[in-house]
Each structure stands twice: as C-alpha cells, then as structure tokens.
C-alpha cells in the first residue's frame, strides 16, 4: 500500500509515497507521471501528482490506496475546489482531524497481481495512452514492449489466483504465487534493467509491463518469485570503496608506526651533559 500525501513528511511517518524529491529521475517514471497528470511535465527534481491526476487510471496502477490532503482546500482556487469535491464523492474519507484528511482509493491495484493475457505495444507512450483512456484493463491484460518467451494460458477461474508479497526490502522482493494456469506476475514496482528475477531459484526474464512496472512469467501452480537488485556498477562501487577504506586504514597505521618509531629512536639517541 502506498500513500499520496500533501507534504514531504512521508519518510518521517514510515509511509511509502509515489511523490518525492530526486535530482536523478528514472526517465520511465518521469514520463509515466507526466502522462498521469495529463501531459504536465515534471519539475527537474520533484515528482508530483497534480489535481488532474487524481482520477487517472495510472494512479491506481501505482498501488496508491490512500490520499492525504489538507482538511480544508484552498479557497483561492475555485475551479480546483469544485474538482476536488467531485473527487471526494468517489473517494470516501477514512480519517479526518483539524488539519488533515485521508481519502481512500478503492480502485487501487495491489502490490502484486497475476494476469493471463499480454498485448504487445511499440513503446512506453503507446502503453500509457491505452491505459490513460481505459482502453485496456490492467487487471486482466499486461501491455508488454516485447513478446514473452513463455506461453500464457487463460485460466478457467482467475479469481483463485494469488500473489502474496512475503518479503519487501529496498533491494529484494519475494512473492508467493498460486495460479491455475501459466500467467504473468505484475508488480507495482518501477522497472530498471538491474533488477533480476528468479522463479523457484531459477533465473527468469523481467519484462516491462504497462510502460513502467516489472513483470515475470510464472508457471501454473505454486511458486516463489524473487526479484533482486543486482547492479554490477553498484558492486564495483562498493568494491572500490572497500579497497579505498582498507588502503586508507593501512596508510594511517603505517604513518602512525613510522611516527612512533621515529619518536622512540630519537629518545634513544638523546644524551645529557653536565659542566665540570
């Protein structure tokens, strides 16, 4: 579950948030959020959801279940206030105090789900156009930018499919799946080439689904899917940092030993003399 909050306090409260500050946006996420907001380009270091994006189907794909807003909307923006009131009519208030209100987005998709149909698209933009206009139901069909090497099969009863996130860390996600037929596990997580997938310990391709998300083909039955962030540049950076730290420690110790020896040697050669 993620939240969409009205200020930058999500990290302090332990909330996952689709907005934020980052000087190095992932291009796909930037394009996705721009499409979500009706074409408004993102600030070069901020990612924001504007009022036009609150009703976008693309927001549901990001697992945004709760929207945190000020208790009283701005009185200066008459059009925005009216638009927000319409939004409130379909998003019930689940918490309210004098300063904050929490609205529930019941259309939000889960963190992980299974589909048994895939449609090939030529680009991220094509996928976002289809999803933004509700021409494709992402709960049923994944939009992929390449043909999956695995065969998908329609399930007689997809309602029995289950995808349970059993482990979630910054660099690793584990999902237990159960499906009546082969399908695609879709995760509401941003795709990046350094993410690697393993199905029951065996390597599996990671596909870009719906212009942004990660997806992995799964066989029928019960399986464990692991996604790990395995970046060779990250490993190289860590290795260089470790070597540099060891070298710095060694140089510091060496300099200290030389200084100590020099001090001891100087004392041994020091003599005193007295006048007759």
List each language-model region with its residue ranges.
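Extracytoplasmic
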Residues: 1-158, 180, 202
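Active-site-proximal, structured, solvent-exposed surfaces of multi-pass membrane proteins
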Residues: 8, 19, 65, 109, ...
């Amino acid at each position: 579950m993620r939240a969409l909050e009205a200020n930058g306090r999500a990290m302090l409260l332990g909330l996952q948030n689709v907005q934020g500050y980052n000087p190095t946006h992932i291009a796909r996420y930037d394009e996705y959020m721009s499409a979500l907001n009706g074409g408004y380009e993102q600030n070069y270091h901020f990612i924001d959801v504007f009022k036009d994006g609150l009703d976008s189907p693309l927001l549901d794909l990001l697992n945004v279940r709760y929207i945190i807003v000020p208790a009283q909307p701005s009185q200066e923006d008459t059009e925005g206030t009216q638009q927000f009131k319409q939004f409130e009519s379909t998003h019930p208030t689940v918490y309210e105090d004098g300063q904050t209100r929490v609205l529930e987005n019941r259309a939000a998709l889960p963190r992980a789900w299974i589909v048994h149909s895939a449609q090939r698209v030529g680009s991220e933009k094509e996928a976002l156009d289809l999803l933004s206009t509700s021409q494709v139901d992402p709960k049923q069909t994944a939009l992929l930018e390449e043909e999956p090497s695995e065969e998908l099969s329609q399930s007689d009863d997809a309602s029995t499919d289950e995808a349970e996130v059993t482990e979630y860390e910054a660099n690793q996600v584990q999902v237990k799946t159960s499906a009546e037929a082969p399908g695609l596990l879709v995760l509401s997580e941003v795709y990046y080439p350094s993410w690697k997938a393993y199905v029951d310990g065996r390597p599996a391709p990671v596909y870009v689904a719906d212009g942004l998300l990660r997806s992995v083909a799964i066989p029928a039955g019960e399986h464990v899917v692991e996604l790990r962030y395995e970046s060779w540049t990250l490993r190289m950076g860590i290795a260089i940092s470790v070597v540099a730290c060891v070298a710095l420690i060694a140089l510091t110790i060496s300099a200290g030993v030389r200084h100590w020896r020099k001090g001891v040697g100087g004392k041994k050669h020091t003599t005193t003399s007295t006048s007759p």
